[in-house]
């Protein structure tokens, strides 16, 4: 599939998500390259169907994010007028054993707070920047999944990292300065 075909597929998926879940759907926006592509595409789909509607974005701040990511997030949210909700875990980071057990750490700092926020905000669906080529476990996933109480959509599932960067350059999208320093992914500092 060409990038143009992948983009068209992603837009069709987002239109389907909009039809099924409505404009209350939010983008799970990390400030990373992948979810920024999803954010921009969703913005276009939403603007076409609901001119003037605010783009909802949910950002997870674990308390361990790089300062550059937080600066980028806040700057772009202001510049683009996003309806940004920042979610934080209910964990005392001074006492928490960061990255001692990566699975527990991700559960406590990411999964639990994200699911709680989605429920509290009553979000019917969350669009993510998940790509199949990032992890073998993701390769067999469907683009739309039920998470019990809400759905998660991965509209750019078939995109490669090269596709994402090509789209960024062609569309002149901004990106976090850490990518210019050689980072390929912008997770929590202890795990990098």
Where are these predicted regions, by residue range?
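Nucleotide-activated chemistry modules centered on ATP-dependent adenylation/adenylyltransferase
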Residues: 1-192
